From Swiss-Prot:
The keyword Membrane applies. InterPro entries: P-loop_NTPase, Rab, Small_GTP-bd, Small_GTPase. It is found in: Endoplasmic reticulum membrane; Golgi apparatus membrane; Cytoplasm; Preautophagosomal structure membrane. GO terms for biological process: autophagosome assembly; endoplasmic reticulum to Golgi vesicle-mediated transport; intracellular protein transport. GO terms for molecular function: GTP binding; GTPase activity. NCBIfam families: small_GTP. Its main location: endoplasmic reticulum. A lipid is attached at residues 202-203 (S-geranylgeranyl cysteine). This is GTP-binding protein ypt1. Pfam families: Ras (PF00071). The record marks 203 as: Not methylated. It is a peripheral membrane protein; Lipid-anchor.
Length: 203
């Protein structure tokens, strides 16, 4: 048994490029924010450990590239994931419309019963918002998926999003501590790299 944690969960952040996945990860893992973040090529991950309902949970959070042409790279990373957060940009209708495609990717590559969470990011950009909360909530409810609007810029609901996902995975796993020890999710540190490609608004 590992004395450092009771649970080790692998989470994925997926969604179109530019919706703010990397910024959500930076805000949750490091409590930092930058207006212009280098777009992720391939996969990168961060780790954060915290207490949840009297247990120590270690999250390994993978930030997958959103561009269509990199989906073949990230498909292998769906395997072994305990939870997947689908992110769209509340100021970008197309990114919300594409959520259905990302859900199909989950059905195709992830394990059956994997926990899912829908997140509408950049909620601080009220004047530019085009995807209404009620529309996204109705969509999420129809699929029985939890839904939150977040802002990596002002921290709104970022912590709540990851805690919600962690709590759901913990409930699904029951009292099986070290739940992920049997999952085929081992990956080598350093496989994911960041390459300077383009800057994107990170909200």
């Amino acid at each position: 048994m590992n004395p450092e944690y009771d649970y080790l969960f692998k989470l994925l952040l997926i969604g179109d490029s530019g919706v703010g996945k990397s910024c959500l990860l930076l805000r949750f893992a490091d409590d930092t924010y930058t207006e212009s973040y280098i777009s992720t090529i391939g996969v990168d991950f961060k780790i954060r450990t915290f207490e949840l309902e009297g247990k120590t949970v270690k999250l390994q959070i993978w930030d997958t590239a959103g561009q269509e042409r990199f989906r073949t790279i990230t498909s292998s990373y769906y395997r072994g994931a305990h939870g997947i957060i689908i992110v769209y940009d509340v100021t970008d209708q197309d990114s919300f419309n594409n959520v259905k495609q990302w859900l199909q990717e989950i059905d195709r590559y992830a394990v059956e019963g994997v926990n899912r969470l829908l997140v509408g990011n950049k909620s601080d950009m009220v004047d530019k918002k085009v995807v209404e909360y009620s529309v996204a909530k109705e969509f999420a409810d129809s699929l029985n998926i939890p839904f939150l609007e977040t802002s990596a810029k002002d921290s709104t609901n970022v912590e709540q999003a990851f805690l919600t996902m962690s709590r759901q995975i913990k409930e699904r796993m029951g009292n099986n501590t070290f739940a992920s020890s049997n999952a085929k999710s081992s990956v080598k540190v350093g496989q994911g790299t960041n390459v300077s490609q383009s800057s994107s608004n990170c909200c």
